[in-house]
Amino acid sequence: KGFAAGVVSTARVTHATPAATYSHICHRDLENDIAAALVPGGTGYNSALGATGLEVVLGGGAQFFTPFKSGGKRSDDRDLVAELKAKSYTVANNATDFKAVDPAKTDRLFGVFTSSHMSYDLDRDAAKEPSLAEMTTKAMDVLAKNKKGYFLMVEGGRIDHALHETTA
């Protein structure tokens, strides 16, 4: 329908809730396959997302986008971050890179700031990880350029985890 779309989460972007936005993988634990579903035109890509895929993906979970040899969990040696860069995504790996992104000059933004889930907000190092509010604001600024509108899935995933642990 022409809407821009994105996901923002303090959990891994391959975790169940954000993954349901863009992936048709049958099991939530298949996070390598879920990550591959984000790369437009790549093996495992969810073609229901159209030719260009999501415009914004921000959160945790870098391990599912990088191969074993680079410290990730991908056994297929695919470097999905490099593949996304090749598809014209602006990539931010830390809060400094993220803050430097100009939404007016950015059409596609990908940022996974931690290997797994992002830190609880009380433990977050602001130099390494943007906050949920910062990610959401930047995502909205990028997506709002689409005159037809946008859909943005925002999840405070770490509050869910804290509640599971009864540490909220």
Which residues does each predicted region cover?
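Metal-dependent active-site segment of extracytoplasmic phospho-/sulfohydrolases and closely related
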Residues: 168
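Catalytic cores of secreted/periplasmic or lumenal enzymes
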Residues: 134-135, 165
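Short acidic, glycine-rich surface-loop motifs adjacent to enzyme active sites
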Residues: 148-165
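Surface-exposed loop and adjacent secondary-structure segments within mature catalytic domains
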Residues: 1-130, 134, 140
